[in-house]
Amino acid sequence: MSKAKDTGILRFDDTPLAATFPLVAIITSKVVGGVKIVGRKGLDSTEFSIVGTQDSLKGSYVIAKYLARTTPSLSLYGENALSASKIDEFIDKFAHLKSEKFNEFLKEMNEYLTLRAFLIGFNLTLADIVLFARIKMVKEIQEEINKLGKTIPHLNRWYGYLSQLESFVEADNAFNGKKETKASGKAGAEGTAATTEKVAPQKGAMGWVGNFEALNLPGLVEGKVVTRFPPEPSGYMHIGHCKAAIINNYYAEKYNGKIIIRFDDTNPSKEKEEYVENIIKDINNLGIKYEKITHTSDYFDLIHDYAIQMIKEGIAYCDDTPQVKMSEERDNAIESVHRNNSVEKNLEMFDEMKKATEQGVKCVLRAKLDMAHIDKAFRDPAIYRCNSTPHHRTGDKYKVYPLYDFACPIVDSVEGITHALRSNEYNNKRNLYNHYLEILHLENKPYISDYSRLSFFNVLLSKRKLQHFVDTGLVSGWTDPRLPTLQGITRRGLTVAALKEFILSQGASAANTTLDLGKLFVGNKAVLEPTCPRYTAIAKATAVKFTLSNGPTLPEVKDCLKYAKDPSMGTKKVTFSNNLLLEGDDCNQIKEGEEVTLMNWGNAIVETLQRNENGDVVSMTGKLHLEGDVKKTDKKLSWLSSDCADTVTVVLQDYDYIITKPKLEDGDDLDTFTNKNSKFEIEAFTDENILTLKLNDKIQFERRGFFNVDQVGDGVKPYILIYIPSGPIKPAGAALYPFKKVEKVAAPVNPKPTAKKQEKQSKK
């Protein structure tokens, strides 16, 4: 990247840790780029000179606001007047904080950030920068954060994420008097100078923040936007449904509008109140603040009246043609023998349908559109069909139900929806949606638009197929960690924050792509890394006893940090003794006389190894060598004392894909490509620290990875922890055996083309 011309010069007093240090202006300059930063000790004020003019600005906040306004593409000052005002409101609040309110304020911010990656919207703004700077510069706030510790996990996550961004790291180094290691100019006699390059917007954990302008939606009026999320209560929400909910909510939030949750309950054969309750639970977990919950069944009488209106206007008719024949006629543009029935005849047949008589159940009500239309969706589609199954809300009041394509535009219009956003699997129905609005003379005409459907390799998002897995017992239920339902994938450890960022990072593009599920978990790792305490687990079946001749003969219990990089997480109890348990797979790679490092303790020398008939190490002896250099050892080993007050046995689980083929094609037999062995588990030893964990707590077993607490032990049932992937899914439970040595097979060397030619010539 070529160096861009500087647009301004920022001069400030660079005395480390000074109360007047312009951290807000420096971070903003780093984010925006193109600012020459000059620090000199003793300057009276912070000043920003605009290159090419005689103008200058003074004051850290004033300079930051100017830089944010000059780079609107970064949205540092929000995306509209409302978000800019909210940013100003936050900045004013942060600036006038009183010390006696610090505790209350931090708890408030933690709750506010529960389901947010940033303070305003979905991008970094000045509000984030100012709050970060206040925390960094006010010692009393830092002390209060340390006191609150794990009780403010969401604020800690937010702060930890910003702390690792390059712009913040460089500014923090300057604040602490450290020399920059990147993009630094040479130190002059009078001070230091650094010129930054023009940079693109900050990346999130998933990549660039998605482009939501791609849909080019008209009529996005502040305070007037009304969207909806219309799930069918025929199963649990999966991540595809989550995308629909999050994108519709994005526009409602961005334009200070509303989102309505509407259950499309038009097929009683598949629907259950259980599904309704769990979908509402999932929507709440996504942090969506909906205006109200409605049901299509609230409008059954109204939709019925529109159907009668169509019959009377001669644009709907009843048809008892068998389904297979009707499909063939539609494919071949052949009109039904009932197409020109009289209005009276159609009303009579529709009445039979409503009574679910023997003749009535053979019929459907069809819209009379255009059987010769090039778009087959217009070839007299069905709009009502019979179903005698009792409805979970209305019981047996109705025997006929509207189809989704007919009911949806009616209810959208009546509920005042302005924008209906749905995945492009419905793209071929968009014109039909608008046509119903026209022929029914509905005044409110929502704008309908499509975005790409989520698709992952080796993952099915079809509710029918997911239901098959549940019904056949392949999985334990809709919340099984192998399923892509929200409740399933969060049991596997995916955080809602990571899921939301992933979906928003995709933007609203209509281009379909199939992704690796591991990409979801890469972003999840960025959320977990700064927030998870560290513990130790040793595989039980292969644990090796290591006896130290000079170790503590009586167990010594010490308080150690749960996470060395974040003391605010508190401490854990660690037992030190002369009898340790080590990972068998680690020990199989150790040689007698080798010096190794016992993590968080020091070095030890292995003197003897005892092996079984298979050649596996079963026990070792050695001695501590704490004066040894941990940097010079090849092996850093996890360990537990076998003399712990409470050695707790836990179950560690991991899962493989259910589907063995990356993408199923039409005609593929589902059972042929179903993995019948996709759940794996081992027992492991841990210590008493595990007894403090609660359901869904997330931790890291050092060197093993992140785990989610799926079951809390009670003396009868064990603790169960599920492995959380941090990238591509490892096959066959391999994640449970991270220390097993894998023999690498050398790849065959292909001779270069010139070598091949020489070989041929020599043969000739």
Curated annotation (Swiss-Prot):
Pfam families: GST_C (PF00043), tRNA-synt_1c (PF00749), tRNA-synt_1c_C (PF03950), tRNA-synt_1c_C2 (PF20974). Its main location: cytoplasm. Keywords: Aminoacyl-tRNA synthetase, ATP-binding, Cytoplasm, Ligase, Nucleotide-binding, Protein biosynthesis, RNA-binding. GO terms for molecular function: ATP binding; glutamate-tRNA ligase activity; RNA binding. It catalyses: tRNA(Glu) + L-glutamate + ATP = L-glutamyl-tRNA(Glu) + AMP + diphosphate. It is found in: Cytoplasm. It comes from the Eukaryota. InterPro entries: aa-tRNA-synth_I_CS, Gln/Glu-tRNA_Ligase, Glu-tRNA-synth_arc/euk, Glu/Gln-tRNA-synth, Glu/Gln-tRNA-synth_Ib_cat-dom, Glu/Gln-tRNA-synth_Ib_codon-bd, Glutathione-S-Trfase_C-like, Glutathione-S-Trfase_C_sf. GO terms for biological process: glutamyl-tRNA aminoacylation. L-glutamate binds at residues 228-230, 264, 404-408, 422. Belongs to the class-I aminoacyl-tRNA synthetase family. Glutamate--tRNA ligase type 2 subfamily. This is Probable glutamate--tRNA ligase, cytoplasmic. It comes from Dictyostelium discoideum. The gene is gluS.
